[in-house]
């Protein structure tokens, strides 16, 4: 009489290879990861199959914001979003001209301003101009505005040609949910307000 284990082995050996592979595939499929639609609800799986790029984008979005200066405000630097190339993404909000940090983490914070002016008249006495731009942090840990990034420059207008100066700075900071990011600028009447010259933003790393 043939032992049961030998009988089972003989049946396996006699099974066509393609049937064995099919059975193995059916066992592995429920635990497969990274395949479109696997491990998702029926509606989510259908969305992933129909719009794979959209599904990937929703799973990788991080908090980010990019603001530009409002050119209609000549005597103040007012930030605006949702216009031109400015935006608020994944929790960032703009309130009282400050960015509100949506979640705790490490963020890259950046800002740029560009100043310009005319040459002075030969009959006038040239007056040096003080230009400065600063990104500030206000949080529950520091109940006052703490400078994060700052630049300063003294400009001496020339006699022959107009002048132009830019300031850019950016760095990574550990921020807490609810922190407020704002700016302070000296020399606002000389700002060149356009989307490519005056901007302020942050994004999660």
From Swiss-Prot:
Subunit structure: Homotrimer, and heterotrimer of either two LTB and one LTA subunits or (less prevalent) two LTA and one LTB subunits. Interacts with TNFRSF14.
Compartments where found: Secreted; Membrane
Keywords, in A-Z order: Cytokine, Glycoprotein, Membrane, Secreted, Signal
Signal sequence range: 1-34
Function description: Cytokine that in its homotrimeric form binds to TNFRSF1A/TNFR1, TNFRSF1B/TNFBR and TNFRSF14/HVEM. In its heterotrimeric form with LTB binds to TNFRSF3/LTBR. Lymphotoxin is produced by lymphocytes and is cytotoxic for a wide range of tumor cells in vitro and in vivo.
InterPro entries xrefs: TNF, TNF_beta, TNF_CS, TNF_dom, Tumour_necrosis_fac-like_dom
PROSITE patterns to which the protein is assigned, alphabetical: THD_1, THD_2
Pfam families documented for this protein: TNF
Record: glycosylation sites: 41, 96
Lineage: Eukaryota, Metazoa, Chordata, Craniata, Vertebrata
Family: Belongs to the tumor necrosis factor family.
GO cellular component entries: extracellular space; membrane
Domain THD: 63-205
Gene Ontology molecular-function annotations: cytokine activity; tumor necrosis factor receptor binding
Protein name per its UniProtKB record: Lymphotoxin-alpha
Organism: Macaca mulatta (Rhesus macaque)
GO BP term, pick one: positive regulation of extrinsic apoptotic signaling pathway
Gene: LTA
Source species, domain of life: Eukaryota
């Amino acid at each position: 009489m043939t032992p049961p284990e030998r009988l089972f082995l003989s049946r396996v050996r006699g099974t066509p290879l393609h049937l064995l592979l099919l059975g193995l595939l059916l066992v592995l499929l429920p635990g497969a990861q990274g395949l479109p639609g696997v491990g998702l609800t029926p509606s989510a799986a259908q969305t992933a199959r129909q719009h794979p790029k959209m599904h990937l984008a929703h799973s990788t979005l991080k908090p980010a914001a990019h603001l530009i200066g409002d050119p209609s405000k000549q005597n103040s630097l007012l930030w605006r979003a949702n216009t031109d190339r400015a935006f608020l993404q994944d929790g960032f909000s703009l309130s009282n001209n400050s960015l509100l940090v949506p979640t705790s983490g490490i963020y890259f914070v950046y800002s740029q301003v560009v100043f310009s002016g005319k040459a002075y008249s030969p009959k006038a006495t040239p007056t040096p101009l003080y230009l400065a731009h600063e990104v500030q942090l206000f949080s529950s840990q520091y109940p006052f505005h703490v400078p994060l990034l700052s630049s300063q420059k003294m400009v001496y207008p020339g006699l022959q040609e107009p002048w132009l100066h830019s300031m850019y700075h950016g760095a990574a900071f550990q921020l807490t949910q609810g922190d407020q990011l704002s700016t302070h600028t000296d020399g606002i009447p000389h700002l060149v307000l356009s989307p490519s010259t005056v901007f302020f933003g942050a994004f999660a790393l």
